[in-house]
Amino acid sequence: SKSVEKNIISGFTSAGSDLSCKDVYLKVNDEKISRSTFSYGETFIICFDDVKGFTSENGYVFPGMGIVITDRAEDTLMMAEDLYNRYTDGMNFSPLQLTANLTVTDPIRSKGEYTLTINIWDKKGNGTFISKFDFKVIENEKIEPQIKNVSYNEIYLFSQGNNKVITDNIVHFEDNIYIIVEGLKGFKAENGVVFPGMELKGTDSSDDIILDYDDLFADYSETGIAESDFSSRVSAHFKLTGTAFNNPLNCELKIWDKKSNASLTVTTEMILK
């Protein structure tokens, strides 16, 4: 049997041949969602509930799941041939729920539109179930950049402790927090070297000074930094200790060119827990 369905709520378009699925939807932080726009670095889970039609062998079924992500030019950015290749002995869950995780980071970029295609198939039969989902990726709206004669690809917060991009601006004591800028261009290069300065300031809601660094690149004022390394990624990081704090942390990172008037200023508020 064959079926085609467009889920208005979830945004998925699905087509099944001998395989069927009760519901296809997304979850973020264990909550079912119906949006199709995500912040750079955000993770969502694609859920296929009560998948039926697989050929059964001694009560076990053998699904495969492949994922492809393409951009609007239909260029393939990411591909996973089979997320379930480790289940060589099959599955006997009932009802059968199949899931996949996606974190929207490099090679996915903010300010872009993409298509996610998921192909589920029966390794012991001919059944298939294909779902497509169009989504957009935006910059973290809690981060405000001001540019002067520069351009950049991405600006985001990163937790070393959790090894992931911070999208809700909630940070924790004792964690190493990074403010990362990728693809920063516009600085004047001399023999392949640029001469940046980097200032990091932070205050709490009582205007107490929490972070105060005038130039994190002071040691490179004479030698400079290789332009290729600088434009690839530049970052500042900090760690806050203790337990008492007057939220929020108002943070400002300024990166400027010591050889021109080019600069990037990043302001953001973080909540410490």
Q: Which residues does each PLM region occupy?
A:
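Short, compositionally biased P/S/T/A/G/V-rich stretches that sit at domain boundaries
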Residues: 3-42, 138-176
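Contiguous beta-strand segments within globular domains
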Residues: 32-64, 166-197
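Short acidic/polar inter-strand loop motif in beta-rich domains
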Residues: 54, 109-111, 121-130, 256-265
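Extended low-complexity, serine/threonine- and proline-enriched intrinsically disordered segments
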Residues: 62-77, 195-211
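A short tyrosine-centered beta-strand micro-motif
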Residues: 112-119, 247-256
